[in-house]
Amino acid sequence: MIDLQEMVTKTLVANDNARARSQQTAVGPSAIGGCQRRLWHDIAQTEPTNTGDKLAAILGTYIHTGIEEAIRREDPFGMQYELEIAVEANGVPGHVDCYDKISHTVIDWKTIKKGTGRYFGSNNRQQVWQVHLYGYLLKQNGYIVEDVALVGIPRDGKMSDILVYNQPYDEAIALEALDHLEKTRDMVAQQLKPKPEKPLAFCADFCPYYDPTGEKGCPSIQK
């Protein structure tokens, strides 16, 4: 009898690996504001040492795709919304989920878990830098940007549990993120690795560069 768990797992992983974003090697906005040690390895193009489980990320991709399809159905001619915009500036590529042409708002979809609001929006530097960088990239490519927004969609919640964070676009935030990127690039050039920032429990599950030996990747914070 066919092993259905194995079949589904291999199919999902292969499909995800074939996606353009999965094959992207240049550092994008989503990577800049998180752990600097992971960013260092991204820039250095370190070979992943921890493949981990990709199901949550894969489901997040499908939710993104579903939202995009739903918006296209409601706005088939793109009168209000422009979707999946590929842009680049300062050597940073980005894929913007959604741009509202009427309110000039950059929108980024986030899949979250119910009850994790304390890690969402203003409490999450990585997300804030990311969405303001999207605004910066769009402005550098001729778009008008007035506001940025994050929409958190819980995989395990109800419609009423959807979270929204929005604020006026602030170029200073984007420039702060770009400065952080440049400083980390300089550290890569000098082979100076930042200290680990995350504990073992987090790194083992979520970081592709977790390496208990520390020889190639990152050993996480050691007690």
Where are these regions (language model features)?
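Short acidic, glycine/proline-rich loop/turn micro-motifs
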Residues: G117-G121, S160-L163
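Metal-dependent nuclease catalytic cores in nucleic-acid-processing enzymes
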Residues: T65-R73, S122-V151
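Residue-level recognition of conserved beta-strand positions in structured domain cores
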Residues: W109-T111, G152
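Short, low-complexity, polar/charged sequence segments that are solvent-exposed and flexible
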Residues: D100, R125-W129, Q167-A172
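Metal-dependent nuclease catalytic cores that hydrolyze phosphodiester bonds in DNA/RNA
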Residues: M1-V106, K113-F120, W129
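Long, highly charged amphipathic alpha-helices
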Residues: Y62, G66-E69, L133, E176-K183
